[in-house]
């Protein structure tokens, strides 16, 4: 069985030609596939019946995701779904909606997709990391998460504007499937999302960052740093591997030089762990002057023992970075009360 959401447009075109049909038949499949959301090949009536039958006989399917559970935040801006994928596995995906800023802009509908079920990185403050690793997701299963939310938004006259690979799992540990999904979702004959509207987050797998830099894509990169030195980082990310903090920062700089895209360093701020003024100054010395940006994330509640810093400590940490010449922001919180925020995803049904 082959899921049509796995195929790049050029692969779809080759398929129909090899089956003896004109190349335009590929677009007759691709257009409804990404904009009409069919559940079966027979839901595409503009295709000849014979072609639909041949697709079915050859084992081609449309693997849409099935919603198992939905939780919506009190303000209605965040929706978390537990989805059953076409292979029977389950994964969490989140939609975050943002109003236009006071200085302009447009409403944003950002989907946070998962690339794995569980995660092997073992970050001690992350609910997904505490699940352990189960399996990698195929490209079609990553794409189907986006398609499911795209269909929900379309019913409200809205559309997907942004995509972040910040859900369950480490994208760089599933590189080939992740990048195939990116290419499908950004292809002008596929889902058609602009490359600059996508951000991939990584714990700092430098080999993956180097490969991504060579893809000639204009996508954003976010690196989860969480500590300015190797000793502290090893405690927070026990499976960080051979990549030192210095290696990770260098890979971010190299990515910026290669792509021209600013790199964001994610920093989960934890009371009494990595939020002291001394650590803020240490972080500033590492990052100042390299064009990077720090996204400060006051830790979200999980089953662990880590506590969220006081607003005073968060502000002080931010001010130290700013006064040292490091661009930074404190992340706008979305979905914390429904366990849909950073570091909270797992496949339990709660609420």
Swiss-Prot record:
UniProt key word Acetylation: no
Top EC class, one word: transferase
E.C. numbers: 2.1.1.-
Binding of [4Fe-4S] cluster, residues: 119, 123, 126
Domain Radical SAM core: 105-337
Gene Ontology biological process terms, A to Z: rRNA base methylation; tRNA methylation
Xref: SUPFAM superfamilies: Radical SAM enzymes (SSF102114)
Cofactor(s) in the UniProt record: [4Fe-4S] cluster
Compartmental location: Cytoplasm
Active site feature: 92, 342
Protein name as annotated: Ribosomal RNA large subunit methyltransferase N
Source organism of the structure: Nitrosopumilus maritimus (strain SCM1)
Gene label: rlmN
